[in-house]
Amino acid sequence: MKRKIIVGSRRSKLALTQSNWVINKLKENYPEFDFEIKEIVTKGDRILDVTLSKVGGKGLFVSEVEQALSDEAIDFAVHSMKDVPSSLKEGLIIGAIPKRESPLDCFVFNQVNSLDELPQGSVIGTSSLRRAAQLLKHRPDFVIKPIRGNIDTRLQKLHAENFDAIILAKAGLARMGWLENTTLKLEDIPPEVCLPAVGQGALAIECRESDQQIRDMLTSIHHEETGICVEAERVFLKKLNGGCEIPIAGFATRANEFVQFKGLVGNADGSIILESEQVGANPSEIGNKVAEDLLSEGADTIIKELRNV
């Protein structure tokens, strides 16, 4: 009799699309298993009338899923890596990180077709302090207005609430199949304008450390280069004790065995943005070094002030 593998997922269309993508990849290698998705509602899904930075805490989109893993109600979980706290619940590990989608943020415009065409005082929809701070540094005239909900909800609000543009993760649009043959007015935001969130574009497949069968299975869809880059980013995040209440960004690439990593911390209005970039062979060392650079420049003061607001 086939073992049935229970996969934990949030119930948004994007989360279910991501979970089904992982399942289909695993079925290619393990056709002898059956897979079933268990939908789980998280705190972040329930609280939609408050920005995430004001809700506070870590793991807003993963805590309930991790609890189901610990309780053995599910066998593994599929998360967006950028939602996963830098420290996992005891007994749980990241079993695999598949190949990364685009890490970039992108504009979805209401009327115009590019950032340069947005008029003075344009209203931009984002609830991300990271995106808001970097965008305000680039265009202090912008008015940032919070927007919550899943991708389809936010796309509806673009027109219904008269935003000039909203910002979404390009990876989500790609996974939903909305980049091809789309009527959406899209433009990638280069990292020089808006450095991505730690882990953005990557998936995290979390499992119990003690479940060797699942761990062996997940190894088949792990992408080494993505895993190395994400390691540098998450070490950086952990060193700074970052969360969604801090404008913090980090993005690593790898070429010729070397990791290039850039990290950033800023204040809420983008008037202070601290940046550092390092290159090296060891992703953990590089992530730590960039964090230490920013701390020496005063990142700890910014973080303390934001947490006391």
UniProtKB/Swiss-Prot annotation:
In terms of PROSITE patterns, this protein maps to:
PORPHOBILINOGEN_DEAM
- Which co-factors does it depend on? dipyrromethane
Q: Which reaction does it catalyse?
A: 4 porphobilinogen + H2O = hydroxymethylbilane + 4 NH4(+)
Q: Does the keyword Secreted apply?
A: no
Q: Which Pfam families match?
A: Porphobil_deam (PF01379), Porphobil_deamC (PF03900)
Q: Name one GO biological process term.
A: heme biosynthetic process
CDD domains, per database record: PBP2_EcHMBS_like
Q: Pathway of this protein?
A: Porphyrin-containing compound metabolism; protoporphyrin-IX biosynthesis; coproporphyrinogen-III from 5-aminolevulinate: step 2/4
Q: What else is known?
A: The porphobilinogen subunits are added to the dipyrromethane group.
Tell me how this protein assembles: Monomer.
Q: What does this protein do?
A: Tetrapolymerization of the monopyrrole PBG into the hydroxymethylbilane pre-uroporphyrinogen in several discrete steps.
**Which family does the record claim for this protein?**
Belongs to the HMBS family.
Name this protein carries in UniProt? Porphobilinogen deaminase
- Give the organism the record lists: Listeria monocytogenes serovar 1/2a (strain ATCC BAA-679 / EGD-e)
